[in-house]
From Swiss-Prot:
Transmembrane segments: none annotated. The keyword Transferase applies. Residues 343-473 are annotated as: Cytidylyltransferase. This is Bifunctional protein HldE. The active site is at D263. It comes from Ectopseudomonas mendocina (strain ymp).
Amino acid sequence: MKLTLPRYDQAPVLVVGDVMLDRYWHGGTSRISPEAPVPVVRVEQIEDRPGGAANVALNIAALGAPALLVGVTGEDEAADSLTDSLAAAGVEAHFQRIEDQPTIVKLRVMSRHQQLLRMDFEEPFNTDAAAMAREVEALLAGVKVLVLSDYGKGALQNHQVLIQAARKKGIPVLADPKGKDFSIYRGASLITPNLHEFETIVGGCADEAELVSKGAKLMRELELGALLVTRGEHGMTLLRPEHAPLHLPARAREVFDVTGAGDTVISTLAASIAAGEELPNAVALANLAAGIVVGKLGTAAISAPELRRAVQREEGSERGVLSLDQLLIAIEDARAHGEKIVFTNGCFDILHAGHVTYLEQARAQGDRLIVAINDDASVSRLKGPGRPINAVDRRMAVLAGLGAVDWVVSFAEDTPERLLKQVQPDVLVKGGDYGIDQVVGADIVQAYGGEVRVLGLVENSSTTAIVEKIRNK
């Protein structure tokens, strides 16, 4: 399947479930307490992040989709912090605020990016289930997907009322389940247990065949539209009636913290389905999103640009021939990793040894090399009738195959000035024996603080000379 990122801005999603505040105390540790054999943490920073169902809504909003949230909090400072954080992120929150009961807070003590301790502050909520159902039913009219984010904390009292209300309106219901009784999710469009949660219900699975068999049985018993089992480092398995199982390998480049990964999966699924994606594509996007979020510390959201870059990597556009839009995203990703962007341009009609040497020298000026080449019409204008010898797609393919070249892009004008204004490379490189002031686009690059460098050409290497030699034979 070919992955693309859908338009999330017209894909409203309603999340209902257990909201909580993830609080982090960050500090340094340099000694052991004289009172007990425990480290002493000197707290230097306190950070609050939305957690649980609130993190699901936050992830949906971070992708650019309208996010609505229904949940239960106390009447306290933690609820105020949650409300403020969600409002700042564009989440429309509808909370039942209950006096004399605390908002759920999970406090983590961190030192040097390591979690030393977690403390949970929570009590069972006396939720007004009827009032919540009325609130949800009223909000369903303006959304395309309903998410039940269930942490078993008491916000969700009557799952079936909510599922049936959504089904009557033709709205898909996605549930992130919890507990030992999955029958409460009967009739959901999709549930997303992790492997441990799944095996708690169906028993241990010795291999994938047993997982598929038990999953199919569970779907039949609960009348589910689909089942997605998240399996950590083994990826995900999507099961659907009348379809072959879809196994997706894990995509994490580096696992730093799995906190909130399940929230990221269901939020990306929900936003993608709301945006019109077919389920296999939505699952593939969720798999990529999970691979990104486990590389972050703590409860975290991913943005649409981050997911778009992951899609590009998946589709092989991290290197090679790119469109301008793809190139700009790739550059953004490279700069986020502190890489220096080098730019050169030319016709590159017949690639020869001089070109290869020059491009290797250009690549050495930074971390990433962009080669911009004139399209066929502009080469003809510059070089005259009979040129180019090779069409632009062939010239680009040859350049993309060189180890020194990261990205190849074409332009239609006679000069790359428009492209330079959009790309804004750190270094503009040209080959020749002329001064910097004669380099086309030098003024553009220097105006924003970039560098311009002129590299010497390899002697006795000329495309024009090669063409003339061939024609004279």
